[in-house]
Amino acid sequence: PNSDPLHKVTILPRGMALGVTWTLPEERHTYSREYFQDVICKAMGGRVAEQIVFDHVNSGAANDLEQATMIARRMVREWGMSDAIGPMAFAGQQQVFLGEDLMTSGREYSDEMARKIDEEIGRILREQEQRARDLLVKHRRGLDLVAQSLLDNETIDGAMVSRLIQQGLGEPSKQPNDTKPNV
């Protein structure tokens, strides 16, 4: 509920991607921790759905994992969005200057802090992966309906995804006779 609204989903290949999910970014000047958690959770969704449905994972979610990791890293290192690390910001890797210890590669924090940062990034990713799993298990029927609609139509809009998820929960759709996707 805190991230940008879903616009469209397609299973048609786009560039290197086997399918794409588009959102409609809202104009914002600042972003909350909850916003980034939702973005990471959404990025984990495809990989987790594959685990739930097929009981395996493949390399298809590589870009999603890369984006999720980058956001989690920035949450911890730049935006002070980690309770474990606290309100600290660490600049990106600096160039190594003559006489500087090559082992630290220009870091402005200790090996112990680097370990804590890595642990916190991993915790955020695992937490949002579990959240995605819990949501997809709860909405499994909706997931199956969305998947079937994508197989039938290749592309569906965000409103159709919402209707299919509501249908999967047994909730009445706002437009009960509307089964054609709006693309």
Predicted features by range, described:
Residues 1-183:
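Soluble catalytic regions of large protease machineries
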